[in-house]
A protein has these predicted regions:
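Single conserved hydrophobic/aromatic residue that forms the stacking wall/gate
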Residues: 1-11
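Active-site neighborhood of phospho(di)ester-bond hydrolases with catalytic His/Asp-centered motifs
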Residues: 12, 46-55, 75-78, 145-151, ...
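Active-site-proximal loop/helix segment associated with metal-binding centers of metalloenzymes
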Residues: 15-29, 109-142
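A short acidic, amphipathic alpha-helical/loop segment
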Residues: 63-67, 84, 88-89, 156-160, ...
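Beta-strand-turn-beta hairpins that frame and shape the catalytic cleft
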Residues: 99-108, 138-145, 246
Length: 246
């Protein structure tokens, strides 16, 4: 149930199926770096819908396309992603324009930026970075969950924190990097520290590490950071396949 438990897991091909992303940090490393920690049947057994924040290979790949039942509701950010996923055989693809309801849960789209202003000014990199949404999950009597998505810290993130006041914040903190750019295309440890200061009453869940080649920050790095800053009570760093009860 989206209300009671949060499992953050992409359905990916077997370990080393794909070459690393060209032009990124550690590009020689094939990916996924790990296999799925649970069987596909177990993973999908209680899934009632899938949220695809964007369709980059590390979020939506051939195994996801082949394994997810084609009748399962898929929630996406825009028309382009909807058309792509329909072309892959799925027949219930819904765009979160602003918000929608599903099984007593309200899903609200939030904005972000999959890289810095400098990166989006690059005519080659900008279309590759593309768009990536975040999602707010709200349900009666349940904590409000903010899935930040693949973004750096932007005014859209600030607006979401102010507007929705989330109780649980899921942050992609692998600090994925493009060669030739000092900054990252997603968040990292400094953003965790910033979030703790910004929302000290929220539970932060740090994910999107140790599975794809271009993430420069590992779980070990994050754990060292939170321990060194005495913020263990605020931040959880789940293992692959771990389910966190909210």
């Amino acid at each position: 149930s989206l209300r009671r438990r949060q499992r953050q897991m992409c359905i990916r091909d077997r370990k080393d199926t794909y070459p690393g992303f060209e032009g990124t940090f550690n590009y020689q490393q094939r990916m996924p770096i790990v296999d799925l920690p649970v069987s596909m049947d177990n993973l999908l057994s209680n899934v009632t819908a899938v949220v695809v924040t964007h369709t980059h290979l590390d979020h939506w790949d051939d195994t996801a396309i082949k394994s997810i039942p084609k009748s399962l509701p898929i929630f996406v950010q825009n028309t382009a992603d909807k058309e792509l996923i329909i072309s892959q055989g799925f027949n219930d693809v819904r765009i979160i324009f602003e918000s929608l309801e599903f099984n007593g849960i309200t899903l609200r789209k939030t904005g972000g930026s999959h890289g810095t202003v400098e990166m989006y000014a690059n005519p080659v990199l900008a279309p590759l970075a593309g768009d990536a949404m975040g999602v707010i999950f709200e349900a009666e009597g349940e904590p409000t969950v903010y899935l930040v998505g693949d973004t750096v810290w932007t005014s859209d993130v600030e607006k979401a924190l102010l507007r929705f006041d989330p109780n649980v914040i899921i942050m992609n903190t692998g600090y994925a990097q493009i060669l030739g750019f000092e900054d990252s295309i997603i968040m990292g440890t400094k953003d965790i520290g910033r979030m703790v200061v910004r929302k000290p009453e929220a539970k932060i869940i740090a994910v999107h590490m140790d599975t794809v080649n271009h993430t420069a920050t590992s779980r070990e790095d994050v754990r060292k950071f939170i321990k060194g800053n005495n913020i263990e009570i605020h931040v959880a760093v789940p293992e692959d396949g771990e389910t966190i009860t909210l």
